[in-house]
Amino acid sequence: MTQQSPYSAAVAEQRHQEWLRFVALLQQAYAEDLHLPLLQLMLTPDEREALGTRVRIIEELLRGEMSQRELKNELGAGIATITRGSNSLKSAPAELRQWLEQTLLTSDK
């Protein structure tokens, strides 16, 4: 039996399918009001905290009032994490960016 490289196309496809399966499971959990217990089961406290920090990073990048360095100091996140968020936001589809702006910048916190 040959071991597949962690970078092979087959492994990448399998990981993508696993991700899509998780997304479908999460959608079903939302429909049945089980999303919070599911996310608590699937994510460690550190992972949940990291997701919350990433939402704040995206929110502040969209707001555009702080430099990446200021964000780093305020949120305690690494500059690489903030840079990845910035780069991801730049390559995000326009519809997603518009939705994020509407959802994160105009909603009550």
Swiss-Prot record:
SS bond partners: none
GO CC terms of this entry: cytoplasm
**Tagged with keyword NADP:** no
Main subcellular localization, coarse class? cytoplasm
InterPro entries hit by this protein = Trp_repress, Trp_repress_bac, Trp_repressor/repl_initiator, TrpR-like_sf
UniProt keywords, alphabetically: Cytoplasm, DNA-binding, Repressor, Transcription, Transcription regulation
One GO MF term, please?
DNA-binding transcription factor activity
Localisation per UniProt entry: Cytoplasm
- Source superkingdom: Bacteria
A family per Pfam = Trp_repressor
Instruction: Please tell me whether the keyword Metal-binding is annotated for this protein.
Output: no
- Annotated DNA-binding ranges? 68-91
Q: Name one GO biological process term.
A: negative regulation of DNA-templated transcription
Primary role: This protein is an aporepressor. When complexed with L-tryptophan it binds the operator region of the trp operon (5'-ACTAGT-'3') and prevents the initiation of transcription. The complex also regulates trp repressor biosynthesis by binding to its regulatory region.
* Stored NCBIfam families: TrpR (TIGR01321)
Q: Which HAMAP family match?
A: Trp_repressor
Q: State how it assembles.
A: Homodimer.
Q: Which family does it belong to?
A: Belongs to the TrpR family.
Stated name of the protein: Trp operon repressor
Q: Which organism is it from?
A: Klebsiella pneumoniae (strain 342)
